Each structure stands twice: as C-alpha cells, then as structure tokens.
C-alpha cells in the first residue's frame, strides 16, 4: 500500500512539474505616448479566454500555455490596439508596449475616442488651456469652472467653489506636494496669478468629491497637477495686454530642468471697474522643476516657487446706478486715500524616490517648505451721496483703515510608498507638518451720516467697527494613510475597488480624526460603453488659520481676535453615485456623465462671504447638508474639436442659531458651456467660447448673520470668446529662417464679457441716520479686448 502511495505521489509531482514547465509568464507595463501608465488596459491571449487588466501603475501579469507561437493583444478604449508575437517563449517574458491615442479619420478631421472613468478623478486636456479666453490670465482653474459642480463668481480670480463648498475647502497638489494660496486675499484685484504655471503642466486630474485617503483633510475637491519632464531643449513664450510668460526646459540622459517666469499687469482690465482711479497692480512668479535620475531606480526631484504680488490703488471717484427701470438709484463717492497690498510667497520641495521593481513598488521621502508674508494696508476717506429719482436718501462721509500683517511658515516631511501585488496596488504614507503663524491686525471704520457719527450716541464720536488681532501660534499636525486599489475581472465585468483610511492629529486642540474612504467602479461585460461608480466616506475640514479666529467683544466695544482652542474639524459624510455612458451620434463620439451626491455636515463653522473674503465665526455652532445632481455632455459638437455642456442642480442649508437658512454657497443651478470650433475654409483659424449662467449667492450686511436677514445676489452671467490663428504649425512650418525653429505660433484675439453684463461681486452697505441700510452693488469687470501671442519651440 505504501508503495502504491509513493508511486501516486511521484506521478502527481511529475504532472505538476510538466504543467509548470509548459506555461509561460508574461509581465510588463503598458504606457501611453508620453510614457505614462495606462490603467484598465486589456491584455489577452488571442484565440483564448486568457486575459487580465493593468493596475493603476499600468502593470500586468498573466500566465499562458506554452506554444510555438503566442499572440498577445494590448488594447484600451481611446487607444490603438497593439499585438505582439512571441516565438517559442520560455520562462518569464517581459513586454512593455506603448499605446497611442486612437483617432478616426473623417476627411481632414480626426475624431478621438474617450477613455472610461472608474474613479472620481477625471482628467483634463492640458492643450486646450493655451487657447482658452481667460480674464484671470490663462489659469488651469479657468477650465475647471466650466466643469459640472464647479463655479466661480469672479473672473479676476482663480478661486472656485465645488458642490456647495467654500474656497477654503479645495486642496491643490503639484507633483504630490500640497500647495497653498495667500490667506488675506479679499478681491480678485489683489490675487494676481494662480500658483500653477500652465506652461509647465503635463497632467491635470480633478475630483469633485469622493477622493481617496491619499489626499489631505479637505471636504470638497482635489486638484492634482503633475509637471512635465522635458525630453530635449524646449520652450514656450506668450505675451498679451495682461502680461507675459516664458518657459525653458532642457534634458540630458540623467537630468532634466524646467524654468518658468510669468508677469501680469492687468490695469486695463481693472479700468473697467466702477471705482475709478490709478490702478498699479504688478504680479511676478518664478518656478523651477529639476529632476535627477542617476540610475533607473533612483529619482531626485526639486520644485521651487517665488511669487510677489503688489497691488496699489489710489481711488478718485465712483458712480453706480442700480435698481429696476422704475426704481433707479444712484450712488456717488469721491475718494481720498490709497491702498497698498503686498503678498510674497516662497515654496520649495525636494523628493527622493527609489523604485524597487517594475511592479509598482517604490518609496518616496519628501520635504517641503512654504512661507508667506502678506501685508494689507489702506486708508481711504470718502464722501457719498445716495439718490433715488432725484430724492436724497443718504449723504455722509466715511473713513476705512486697515493694517494687517500675516507671516506664516509651513514645514512638511512625508514618507510615502506603493506596493504592487498582483492586481492590488497598496499605497501608504506618514507625514508631519509644522505651522508657525504671526498675525497682527488693526481695522476700524468710521461713518458720518447727515452730520452724525454712526452708531449715533449723543455726546460721543464712535466708530462703526473696530477689530484688533495680535496672535502667535506654533502647532504640529501628524497624519497617516493606508489604502488599497484592487482591480479584477469577473464574468459580470471589470471592477475597481479603492478602500483606505486616513488618520490625523493636531496638537493645538488635541483632536484625532479617522477618515475612512471607499470607491467602487464597475464596467459591465455586456455593455462596455457604460461605467458605474459609487464613492463615499467621512471627510474632515481641518481648521487652518482663518477658521479658528474668534471675535470677542471687550467693554469698549472693540472686537478682539482670539484663537479658539476648543475648535473642531468640520465633518462631511458623503455619498456619491455616478455613471458614464459613451456613444456615437452623427458619427462622432460623445460621453454623458451624471453624478448624484449627498453630504451630511456637522461641526460647521459658520461664515459669510464678502467678494473673495470668508469671515468665520470661529466656533462650531452649525450643522447642515448638501444635495445635488451634476451632468455633463462631452463630445465632438463640431467634428474634430472637443466641447462640453455642464448642468448642476444643488441645494445646501444649515441650522444657524436655531434658524434654517441657505448656506453662503447655496447656488441652486449652474449651466456652463465650453465650445470650440474652426472655420472649414480656414482650418488654421480656431474659435473658442466659455459661457456661464449660475444662481446668485445669499449674502447679508456686515456684522450680521443670515439668521438675521439675507438677500440673494443676481445670477452670474458671462460669455468670453476667443479667436486663434495658427501662424506656424506642424503642417506649415518654414524650412529655414527664424520661424523654422518654432513648433507652433498662435495669434489670438479675446473678447471678455462679450454681452457686457454687470455682474455683482459683493455689496457696499450704506446706512442713514435712521439706521436703514441700502445694499449698493459692487460690479465686476465689463467688456474688454485682449490680444495675445503664444509660441512653442
């Protein structure tokens, strides 16, 4: 009996060995034309049911039977199919194919297919940024504001709101490093330029919610930017009536560098504002990106930025007419004084990455530092008249004074890594951040109406508002995260599951946060044109400088700013359900995207919005919700060009002092159109249009809350158009001379605010002696022309 058992065991071992030696393992990485990994690419053995899909790193691995000839096919929606033939393969074979974007030829027009989206991160085409009409100066954010769920109320600013969140609830990353914007910005005139240099951008990814645990504690959105690595000497330059930019890049075998300089001076745009005077804004920005690769496994990267924004304004007068055709009011002011603001920011980061293998296992040690030095200083005196049909409603004087100085240093040290195991991609990280804040501020406002100081108290001269701040703060934040992305194929279709958790601790208030997050994507086997996704989690908005500044009234009526150590992070429990459906109409590709979402909000810190300035109460005293639906139709509205139409419906409400009121970001509807076209007889002449119609936001008078009373601003309506003519291009480049060295040269003409609509950014509140307040609208820019020239080489 023992003899028979040994014979059976020996035969089994021989059979297993025969099977093992009769199989071939095929591994590799699928990338696009730029060398970027392609996720969800299909790898299959032709003529069989054997196949697999690439993971988030573009990696794959499968085992196939040994044969004299093995045909392996690589495919992905939006890319051309590649087939590799293996002759008598043995052992382990590595194939790293490169897939190129798939186009369909229709005469002289090329139509591109669209890739599927199985996560909440969506990609944005970088090339369209260069020819988009943008009053803020050609920022990446200008395209974001046409996306579903995203809105902006100020064309001079790159700030945006996402699905009922505030400007402060959006995080921005460049090369995996979180970056910040100045904190004291209160208007688009002060802001200058976005920290993102569009000439240096290679990839843009954006999420309007439901993002993974790898991203920090923000409740609304993530904008993830990746800068390019030049492959040779290259450059880009641009000049317009708003300013100019220059980018230069160079690379060798182991080293690449890229430098960008931008200058902006949009005094002509500000000249269309109703407050007349001498505008002298100057904005300067320098960025550098250096990458050193001594070996195939080691990568050292440096990123640096210097930004200096000076805003100087000497007002002279202002004349504003508002109301209806039957009830016209006029507001006239004569000014005396000045405003001088300065915002200096410095940012530097370094990262060392070691790649252990080609399966997506790597480790990165990253250090970054951010410093901002901000000064807001103005002394403005004015005399005003408010009339209604020739009848004087109010007359008076006012004096506004502010001296605010903010210095902030943020140091961050992060260790993060990835581990690739079969169809799983595990990511983890640990970070420590030190924040050092110096805050000094003194503000006051005095008003006199009909010879009386407001507030009117007999035998006293009083100011209407006084605020004093003198605070120093040094805190530490620690965070860690762990997540896994698992991609697999079943008989039902393709699945993508991302689950993770983020933990953080802040020593200022002793708060520890646990943030679980999960997303699931599914592409059914029976309908490959449809993709579904479900995402949710617990998201927090960790307080940062402005949120925990609390106003406390002293016995003299002064508002003193104290730091609330009992502050807690705002919490948002989110659920998002979305789908994409790709189809062809008129023999052109389209993609219809729809998402529904609900956010349960608690521990809210109430705030009011004044133009771009958010004024927080400094205490957790509210709760609320956000619910909405976003839809976007993306496709070839015109053959060969990409356009899209977005529609967003949303409602957000909070319980403020026991009263249910709309939140400051309650924008019930938003419609945005981004449209591109070309002239058939002049294909080198391109046309682009960016149009927005969105509901007005609720607002209230200074030093009041929406629980007391509020008004809703008029709807924001704006259309910007641009014409671009290709002077030099791929198909018509001179063979000799100066212009033969250029890849492209474009000459453009933009018309900002084509319909010349007066949009409201905020209100100036006038109070008469009877303490009746009148809301005088502060209008944004009117119609303006811009000429631009851009080139790349």
What residue spans do the PLM features occupy?
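Short, acidic, small-residue-rich periplasmic hinge/interaction motif at the N-terminus
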Residues: 31-34, 41-46, 71-81, 89-133, ...
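Periplasmic N-terminal accessory/gating domains of Gram-negative outer-membrane beta-barrel systems
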Residues: 80, 93, 116-170, 176-211, ...
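Membrane-embedded beta-barrel scaffold of Gram-negative outer-membrane proteins
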Residues: 364-368, 378, 566-620, 625, ...
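Gram-negative outer-membrane beta-barrel transporters
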Residues: 490-493, 597-600, 617-700
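C-terminal beta-signal and adjacent terminal beta-strands/loops
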Residues: 692-700, 725-793
